[in-house]
């Protein structure tokens, strides 16, 4: 029992995170130097994301009997994304207005260091709906894979899958090659995941060593408010959706606990993407659904980022005494409904989208972003964790709506009946 515990990735990553926190706190300079360990692990994961998405989507679509099912899955997924992310935006807006974490700070925007956020503001001006949609189309297929742009790879994979499906038996050889290649890729993922504890240790040691616990105390009310809101969203909103779909949210969280710990250590939901594709398929969701919903959700279903965007924007307004009436807040909500959909497709993710939104609304000082620049790194964990759980739940819901979910396999896996059956066979 003890040996299996020590060998489990869950225990190893958890231990690594704890050691990283201690090192960063007591030896901050040494902790800050551990950054390359976390960066290297995330780069290894990003290296494999494009081929994983390509193989999963192509084999999923090419193996389907009807192409109408693919279109139906995509439409249902986008509808779900829009509804749930809107709920997340509204919840963030309501909570920040009730708690008012920025009230009483009385910060003069003129005293803030605008240079600190100048890079983000400049990048935000380059972002727009048209630019985002145009960016989905790659200049070249090789460029899409080289840059690791998820949506570009997804677009090419969908087109490739459709074309391969139309070939019928003539394309069987290509299908078999891609399926075999997929098995090799997942073998590489298993090797990379053995390094997850080292990556989590390095990333956490750097975070604590670089920013220190003192940063948390200064703006702690916003951080606590945000974390509690994310927990409530997962338990209440996603929990209700899960219950209506026929599974328990806590059992699902237990099922993906290793992926959650990897995300917690690296602050990047992308680090768990390859394993999520595999795990959601083992949970009973058809490969074609998993291949479409998970990668698309990384740009269109960022629940944690949605909560962060509304809370951060209103917090800046409260801290700088920039009054926001109901009209301003509705305008903010409408702008975020559009701008939040490209959060994962831009460098700097949520922070740049926040800068773009504040610039578009025009009522808030862009320099106010400097207030949360220092604590943004600490809030990224909750964003990434909520995003991961949200995309997992979305996959199950969409799979059930389009009747591509094996509910018996879902319940057996979440209730550990499969592992219990294997144990019984071994003992007998």
UniProtKB/Swiss-Prot annotation:
GO terms for cellular component: plasma membrane. It comes from the Bacteria. InterPro entries: C4_dicarb_transport (IPR023954), Na-dicarboxylate_symporter (IPR001991), Na-dicarboxylate_symporter_CS (IPR018107), Na:dicarbo_symporter_sf (IPR036458). The keyword Secreted does not apply. The chain crosses the membrane at residues 8-28, 44-64, 76-96, 142-162, 184-204, 222-242, 289-309, 326-346, 352-372. It is found in: Cell inner membrane. It is a multi-pass membrane protein. The keyword Cell inner membrane applies. Keywords: Cell inner membrane, Cell membrane, Membrane, Symport, Transmembrane, Transmembrane helix, Transport. Its main location: membrane. One of its GO terms (molecular function) is fumarate transmembrane transporter activity. Belongs to the dicarboxylate/amino acid:cation symporter (DAACS) (TC 2.A.23) family. This is C4-dicarboxylate transport protein. The gene is dctA.
């Amino acid at each position: 029992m003890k040996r299996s515990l020590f060998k489990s990735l869950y225990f190893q990553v958890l231990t690594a995170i704890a050691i990283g926190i201690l090192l960063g706190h007591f030896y901050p300079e040494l902790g800050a130097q551990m950054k390359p360990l976390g960066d290297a692990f995330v780069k290894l994961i990003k290296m494999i994301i494009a081929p994983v998405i390509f193989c999963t989507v192509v084999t999923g679509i090419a193996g389907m009997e009807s192409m109408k099912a693919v279109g139906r899955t995509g439409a249902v997924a986008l509808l779900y994304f829009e509804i749930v992310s809107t709920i997340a935006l509204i919840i963030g807006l309501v909570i920040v207005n009730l708690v008012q974490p920025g009230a009483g700070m009385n910060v003069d925007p003129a005293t803030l260091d605008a240079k600190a956020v100048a890079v983000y503001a400049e990048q935000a001006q380059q972002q727009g709906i048209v630019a985002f949609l145009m960016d989905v189309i790659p200049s070249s297929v090789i460029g899409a894979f080289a840059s690791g742009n998820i949506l570009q790879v997804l677009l090419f994979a969908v087109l490739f899958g459709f074309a391969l499906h139309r070939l019928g038996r003539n394309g069987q050889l290509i299908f078999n090659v891609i399926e075999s290649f997929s098995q090799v890729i997942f073998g590489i993922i298993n090797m990379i995941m053995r390094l997850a504890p080292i990556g989590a240790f390095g990333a956490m040691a750097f975070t604590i060593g670089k920013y220190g616990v003192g940063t948390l105390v200064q703006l702690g009310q916003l951080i606590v408010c945000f974390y509690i809101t994310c927990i409530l969203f997962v338990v209440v909103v996603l929990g209700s959706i899960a219950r209506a779909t026929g599974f328990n949210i806590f059992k699902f969280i237990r099922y993906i606990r290793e992926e959650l710990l990897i995300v917690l250590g690296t602050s990047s939901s992308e680090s768990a993407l390859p394993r999520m594709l595999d795990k959601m398929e083992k949970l009973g969701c058809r490969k074609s659904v998993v291949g479409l919903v998970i990668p698309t959700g990384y740009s269109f279903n960022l629940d944690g980022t949605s909560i962060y965007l509304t809370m951060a924007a209103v917090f800046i307004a409260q801290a700088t005494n920039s009054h926001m009436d109901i009209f301003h807040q509705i305008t903010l909500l409408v702008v975020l409904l559009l701008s939040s959909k490209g959060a994962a497709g831009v460098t700097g993710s949520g922070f740049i989208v926040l800068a773009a939104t504040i610039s578009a609304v025009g009522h808030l000082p862009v320099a106010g972003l400097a207030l949360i620049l220092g604590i943004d790194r600490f809030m990224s964990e909750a964003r990434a964790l909520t995003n991961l759980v949200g995309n997992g739940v979305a996959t199950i819901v969409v799979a059930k709506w389009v009747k591509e979910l094996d509910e018996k396999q879902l319940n057996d896996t979440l209730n550990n009946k499969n592992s219990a059956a294997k144990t019984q066979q071994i003992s007998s």
